[in-house]
């Protein structure tokens, strides 16, 4: 009991020191995005389905965030974000997701950069969405669909991770690193490691990203040991168009090794109050002496009704080896708050 008294006294003093004005500065901010679309959706080898879908252009989510000014340019910050399936009124991308699936971290930010602990996006995910014209669209972006539709293992966010993002360390140059420990996840051992670099010079942006995955959500191939992914990306803005390009290599070491080579080219051009978006991605998968191919093309128009609300229409064609081709036609609305 004697050991508890000093701790209780310290806690009481801390609460007394936290004035209403100080607590007001730490008040959390509520924010998010709601996206819904309707249309005919199809995947290779399957029939077309007429549906109303959530999160095709951007995954819907709700988040809270806040920070505490510690003085001397140092801040403590946190964020908690959950995906929302608006069409079902349910949390998560799927029923198997934990509640705070999108982000859950706490960390420090200062002149040295930003360091966070918890669950946060990987450098590979960040670079992939930056260097294609349809951004983070899991429903319509050829690049996102080819990388994260089954090729890259370990999810777009890592649990139990330590992540660091630098400020601008040289003219136009920034970098990020992330790693996590497996912490006994079933069927996997070891840690995940990811690094990324970003360079900006006028109309040019370029990135290089590498990650090595040894744990995360499954399923995992038999005899899985690790997977390595390397990606280069770039964009260049002209007066009337922004051009995008990506090239990547994914190698999965398991009982049967798989090597995938991925390419993406795209463009975004302002037309009226919106943007015409076009992207093509090509993937070659090699398993032993067998090769298969995946080709995805998307064309869309994104029209902004305001800074917070846009409407869009997209057509997409996908062709996979040995499967019938698929065509998707959809239109939707997206609102940020």
Predicted features along the sequence, with ranges:
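Outer membrane beta-barrel
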Residues: 25-40, 49-182, 189-191, 198-202
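Solvent-exposed loop/turn segments connecting transmembrane beta-strands
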Residues: 88, 152-159, 181-191, 253-259, ...
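Repeated loop/turn-to-beta-strand initiation elements of outer-membrane beta-barrel proteins
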Residues: 74-76, 112-115, 170-175, 203-208, ...
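Outer-membrane beta-barrel "beta-signal"
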Residues: 303, 325-337
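Sec/Tat signal peptide C-region and signal peptidase I cleavage site
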Residues: 19-24
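Detector for outer-membrane/organellar transmembrane beta-barrel domains
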Residues: 188, 192-298
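Outer-membrane beta-barrel architecture
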Residues: 63-65, 105-107, 163-165, 196-198, ...
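Transmembrane beta-strands of outer-membrane beta-barrel pores
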Residues: 36-42, 61, 82-86, 121-123, ...
């Amino acid at each position: 009991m004697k050991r508890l008294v000093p701790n209780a006294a310290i806690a009481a003093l801390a609460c007394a020191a936290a004035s209403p004005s100080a607590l007001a500065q730490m008040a959390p901010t509520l924010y998010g995005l709601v996206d819904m679309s309707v249309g005919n959706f199809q995947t290779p080898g399957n029939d077309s389905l007429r549906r109303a879908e959530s999160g095709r252009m951007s995954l819907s989510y709700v988040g809270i965030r806040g920070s505490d000014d510690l003085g001397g340019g140092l801040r403590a910050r946190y964020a908690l974000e959950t995906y929302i399936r608006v069409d079902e009124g349910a949390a998560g991308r799927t029923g198997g997701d934990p509640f705070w699936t999108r982000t859950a971290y706490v960390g420090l930010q200062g002149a040295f950069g930003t360091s966070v602990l918890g669950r946060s996006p990987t450098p590979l995910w960040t670079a992939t969405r930056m260097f294609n014209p349809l951004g983070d669209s899991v429903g319509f972006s050829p690049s996102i669909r080819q990388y994260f539709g089954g090729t890259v293992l370990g999810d777009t966010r890592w649990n139990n991770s330590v992540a660091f993002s630098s400020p601008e360390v040289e003219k136009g140059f920034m970098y990020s690193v992330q790693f996590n420990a497996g912490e006994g996840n079933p069927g996997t051992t070891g840690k995940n490691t990811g690094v990324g670099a970003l360079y900006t010079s006028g109309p040019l942006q370029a990135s290089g990203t590498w990650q090595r995955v040894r744990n995360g959500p499954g399923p995992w191939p038999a005899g899985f040991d690790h997977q390595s992914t390397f990606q280069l990306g770039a964009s260049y803005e002209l007066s009337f168009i922004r051009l995008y390009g990506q090239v990547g290599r994914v190698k999965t070491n398991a009982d049967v090794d798989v090597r995938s080579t991925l390419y993406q080219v795209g463009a975004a051009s302002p037309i009226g109050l919106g943007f015409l978006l076009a992207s093509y991605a090509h993937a070659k998968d090699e398993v032993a002496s067998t090769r298969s191919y995946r080709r995805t093309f998307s064309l869309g128009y994104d029209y902004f009704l305001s800074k917070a609300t846009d409407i869009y229409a997209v057509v997409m064609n996908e062709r996979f080896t040995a499967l019938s081709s698929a065509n998707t036609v959809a239109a939707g609305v997206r609102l940020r708050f």
